Amino acid sequence: PGKVISIISNKGGAGKTTIAVNLAVALAERPNARVGILDANLQFGDVATYLNLVPRASIADAVAEGDILDEMSLETYMTVFNDRLSLLAAPARPELAEAITGGNVKAILSQLKKKYEFVVVDTATDFNEITLSVLDESDAIVVLAGSDLPTLKNMKLCLEILQSLKYGDDKVHIVLNRANSAGGLSVQQVEKSLNLKFFATIPSDGKTVLPSINHGIPFVLANHHSAVAQTVFQLAQKLAPQEVSAPPKSMAAKVLGIFS
């Protein structure tokens, strides 16, 4: 089965959707990879906008299908970004989210895992039934931290909740977004405040990130060589290490090997 990676933050504007989208695209850049994104911010999710997609259907339509949903029928509700990446979008209107339960989300994730090597999930900012269901099904939880005091206060609460839910350090990964942004605390100050070491840090780079959002082109594609894109590729590698195959032996090496 595929690996489920959820991105969470209990503070709006932390860059959750930006990181979720670019992480998914980075994973999809791997040879032969197949990646699904689930927008589980059911009321106000905008993953589709970040990818410049107009969804033909959403998770609400998939849930309305009922118990007969399987990985083949789920395909009809996905919106294709490219041949390696597809999105199951949030409902078009907030009220449509009311019919979707945590059980529905778990069932859908179960089917997505059968079809995709990686399933990246963007979430709402509150620990509601939907978010908790996503976390239960996740193999890795990326918690986004910021370097301002209100975000740090919320971050401490978020980590306490995750601890109380018995999610281990092997599953929860704290990532500092917009590291060393102007006016923010340094990486070292934030680590000291939270009493932890970050799994990864992503630099602040509004000149790359904002145009990418406004044009609906993920920066890992539009600005592949930028520092912010490279750190997302590194994050993808840390979350799901890619095995580097040994280069094929030359004919001379093979011949010499016979006599060794």
Per-region residue spans from a language model:
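Walker A (P-loop) phosphate-binding motif
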Residues: 1-36
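Acidic-aromatic/histidine active-site loop/patch
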Residues: 1-4, 164, 171-172, 176, ...
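Phosphate-binding loop that captures ATP/GTP phosphates
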Residues: 30-87
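C-terminal-of-GTPase-core extension/linker across diverse P-loop GTPases
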Residues: 38, 227, 237-244
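C-terminal boundary of histidine-terminating zinc-finger modules
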Residues: 59, 215-231
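Flexible beta-alpha connector loops of hexameric P-loop NTPases
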Residues: 60-67, 93-99, 149-150
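Conserved catalytic-core segment of NTP-binding enzymes
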Residues: 99, 103-206, 210-211
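Glycine-rich phosphate-binding loops of nucleotide-dependent enzymes
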Residues: 234
